[in-house]
């Protein structure tokens, strides 16, 4: 009963949270008001080698707030959702469902709910997850073995996730039979990268540079739907030094180079010895100086000296004089040579330039002139030069013939001297006429070699006719045969000359009989002349022509 005048007592209301705790059975979650919080976002499965982990992000606006999460999963084809006790009221944003989704041939779903206080969010579901197609293949294990110019890469396929560490390992190669690897190689020296796809577990990289650092990383992939690849860690290895190059360098510097130098030195020594023994140091005679002309294959010889004039020394046996007839013959030969001049003296033009002097070579003539004294000899030489100068026109090229007249000592009687002088004058007239004709022909004939020979003019072996009929061609014996075209100088043997000398029967007064080839080159010293005069001429002849003459006593 209530006391009169006193109000009735009402029970105090309990807090709502306390009422929920009292009403909830012991051990059960307190129900929450759904929809009071936003849902978690980005709910996905992250699977690597069949290790399946569910991931999500916190609800919007609740970052930094202590929110708990509850996860449930669903096997495709069944009717109810299944709870995972380890993933209920957790404060992390991932849940490992590898054991619940270990059958990679099935498909799975998962959902997450956020709880904060008495408020909770609605369930946020993931998409269908197919482990066989969506799991990532982890990188293989890589082992490198280096050589001088190659690197061997050994690959080991990754293993499938194991529930218990004591379980036997299962290779991903057993699950995916078409597993392949993409190997990338980086040359750190040239900074060049190339890739190569392999299906087996061994790869040999050849044709590499020795003593060079190479870095390798490998990716595993399965042909089919695209999936993310996880590359391996970069591993680097340096190739070995090239021992063969060092060995070659040692061979070259220690064997090849010394042997080459030794062979070269011996070759130089052998060549020097051969040249010293077999290659002579002879020089051509000074008289044989080869001069080439303007035309092809036209050459001639010119003596070393410009002009050589040797006066004839006469050995007078009797006093005799040149008759008036001989002098008239000499003048007539000069007149005949002057008549051969094609241009009269009245039409001569003064030369505008100095006359060109050309040498056609020379040959030594042995001229037997029988005179009284040296004065007659000098007069004859001057007469010959004057007659030659008269036959040359001023506007033509002057031709100089160089003669080397050697001394001849002749002993003859007066009658023979007179007859020989006539023959010699006629011969000189013919020679002057031929020289004048060569001077008139022009520059074309200057290129041809002049080849008079050294002849023995034997006056006792010929017969002469009158000066009107002209001198006949005299048979002569060639003592020196010199051909300018071939450059050969031939001297007949002494025996051949002795045979020719035996065929002639000289007179008793002739001092030249049976003296041989060199009788014209030297003479026994006479009582009235120095004994070494002829030897001087012989030595000069040997020096100019480079000859070696051995005289027999």
Curated annotation (Swiss-Prot):
Residues 1-29 form the signal peptide. It is a single-pass type I membrane protein. Widely expressed with highest levels in skin and testis and high levels in brain. Highly expressed in psoriatic skin. Residues 333-353, 462-515 are annotated as: Disordered. The chain crosses the membrane at residues 251-271. The keyword Repeat applies. Belongs to the type II cytokine receptor family. This is Interleukin-20 receptor subunit alpha. The gene is IL20RA.
